């Protein structure tokens, strides 16, 4: 990642640029369980998702993050009620680094002739689902620039999930509220991630002493995480992904 201190200063002093935070969206589908006509019906979905996520400004204060987002959708089945076809999927969202979220209960309808649009008031399952994870990944990225900087994005994701639980397509939305609760409880991990990224930038710029100081803060955060929430899977994944880099900095 770029120099954290420089990026924070740029965010503070440059005018807001209304561009999306996701510079690249890599999507893969596993549609082997769908019929050939259903595969044709979702043919344009990848392009629509990419356009939706990459052109939407999810947070105006952090408009220059240039995040790469990886999405996998595994289609399991479909069902038709009236003129509406609903797809049931599993999904994986990742920033290609230490943020990864697997979801087993995805349900949405899709009309190939329409574009995707997120309405913060009127809930629709597919834009709502995509916006939820867009905000969660964004929040995790912002947390690496500012202590608890992702709070607003996490709260927006929670609001989306709450609207989902009150909709006709409530499958999985209760669990998505729990994801936000788990993240908010694990304040130690959020401290640790921020300290790691600051320490990494200091190390890359030759400040070994400052880097070691940040790594100590990181270790304290990891200890707090274990005390507060035990063996949390997000903490374990962070350590799995970053352990080699941490070891090289010591």
Model-derived features: positions:
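Conserved nucleotidyltransferase catalytic core and NTase-mimicking acidic/glycine-rich helix/loop elements
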Residues: 201-212, 218
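A cross-kingdom marker for long, charged
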Residues: 212-250
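Start-of-domain marker
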Residues: 21-88, 98-101
């Amino acid at each position: 990642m770029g120099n954290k201190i420089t990026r924070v200063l740029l965010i503070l002093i440059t005018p807001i640029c209304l561009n999306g935070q996701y510079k690249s969206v890599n999507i893969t589908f596993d549609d082997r369980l769908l019929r050939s006509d259903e595969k044709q019906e979702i043919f344009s979905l990848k392009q629509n998702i990419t356009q939706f996520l990459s052109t939407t400004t999810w947070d105006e204060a952090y408009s220059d993050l240039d995040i790469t987002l990886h999405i996998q959708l595994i289609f399991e089945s479909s069902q038709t009620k009236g003129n509406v076809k609903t797809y049931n999927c599993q999904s994986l969202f990742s920033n290609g680094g230490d943020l990864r979220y697997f979801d087993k209960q995805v349900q949405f309808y899709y009309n190939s002739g329409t574009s995707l649009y997120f309405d913060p008031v009127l809930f629709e399952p597919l834009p709502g689902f995509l916006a939820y994870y867009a905000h969660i990944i964004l929040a995790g990225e912002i947390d690496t620039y500012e202590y608890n900087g992702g709070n607003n994005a996490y709260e927006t994701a929670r609001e989306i999930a709450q609207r989902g639980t009150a909709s006709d397509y409530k499958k999985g939305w209760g669990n998505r509220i729990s994801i936000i609760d788990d993240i908010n409880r694990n304040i130690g991990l959020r401290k640790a991630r921020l300290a790691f990224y600051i320490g990494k930038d200091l190390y890359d710029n030759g400040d070994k002493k400052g880097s070691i100081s940040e790594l100590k803060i990181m270790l304290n955060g990891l200890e707090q995480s274990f005390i507060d929430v035990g063996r949390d899977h997000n903490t374990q994944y962070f350590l799995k992904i970053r352990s080699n880099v941490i070891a090289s900095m010591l």
